[in-house]
Amino acid sequence: MTGKKLKEGFTTGACSAAAAKAATRLLLKGKPILEIETTLPNKRQVLFTVKRCQLEGEIATCSVVKDAGDDPDCTHGAELTARVRLTKENEIKLKGGDGVAVVTKAGLGLEIGQSAINPIPRKNIKEMILEELQGSSFNGAEVEISVPGGQEMAKKTMNERLGLIGGISILGTTGIVKPYSTAAFKASVIQAIQMAKEYGIDTIVLTTGGKSEKFAMDLLPNLNELSFIQVGDFIGTGIKTSVKESIRHTIIVGMIGKLSKMADGVMMTHRGGSSVNTTMLSTIARSIGVPEEIAIEIQNANTARHVLEICKVSGYKIITTKICEIVAEKCSKHAGTNIMISCYMVDFDGKLLGKCENFSPNVGLNL
């Protein structure tokens, strides 16, 4: 894989626009559409293969299968389907059908009750239809975008938490999915923090995944569900956005692997992007009085989990609290301003191993 250029993919919005354009052309030409060229929001021309092409009286239905490229995307393979009827009105009426979420909470830039088709894809879909209508006797259209299986796909997203119910969102600012990019996930992290702020929440909990989020909810049962935000590997994005949105208190909950990377100053913690620095962990161990032979054992450990096992056996579990202290301090420095940060380390069963509460650069540690 070294040196191989990763393949770009296309967003649900781009595929929806292509399907809508194909359905419009089918109505105007009356001939099967095998391929359709569209203009993405970033003005790039792309040729899409049309999977479904069906004409029934005044209604045409076409679909395009999403290829996410080399991006690990739960909507890869989704069949974005457009059902179109042409009208004489000077308006394109767009709605979501089966498998497209409905907005039920404020703070998303869409009206409550509206289909979760974001503004840029919405504009792109309409533009592609109007492009086809030029020179025809029709001025508008009624369009329904649907995604077979969208409800199941949505279970792997943050949609329900954000108040997007019943399916996936039709997304994309450029039309392109960058392979393994930060773009899509970073956008969801930022959006979740903005929504928490919109609802008056001033304490958020940044977790590194589904398990740590569940454990965090058990540890902090009095917090609103919207307080809990999975940041994955992008802790730095979570911290910076917390500052931007004036969040009063940011709590980090994770396991030893990710927290050890944060303690080393790594704010993008993908396991392939950086490894745990066991030399750093052995230095921490020495700073709290761990015997040299144990410190050497820690330095030679294979993984952060292995370090935890060594500390448990040797009776020096206090290292977990020290790691939490350093994480809070490093995240505070990354924030670049005065922000209160707490850090909790849990094990793989959710047991609390260490914590640092209410660290602030102005007051230091309050354990």
Curated annotation (Swiss-Prot):
InterPro entries: CbiD, CbiD_sf. It catalyses: Co-precorrin-5B + S-adenosyl-L-methionine = Co-precorrin-6A + S-adenosyl-L-homocysteine. Keywords: Cobalamin biosynthesis, Methyltransferase, S-adenosyl-L-methionine, Transferase. GO terms for molecular function: cobalt-precorrin-5B C1-methyltransferase activity. The keyword Transferase applies. Pathway: Cofactor biosynthesis; adenosylcobalamin biosynthesis; cob(II)yrinate a,c-diamide from sirohydrochlorin (anaerobic route): step 6/10. Its EC number is 2.1.1.195. Disulfide bonds: none annotated. SUPFAM superfamilies: CbiD-like. GO terms for biological process: anaerobic cobalamin biosynthetic process; methylation. It is an enzyme of class 2 (transferase). It comes from the Bacteria. Belongs to the CbiD family. HAMAP family: CbiD. This is Cobalt-precorrin-5B C(1)-methyltransferase. It comes from Leptospira interrogans serogroup Icterohaemorrhagiae serovar Lai (strain 56601). The gene is cbiD.
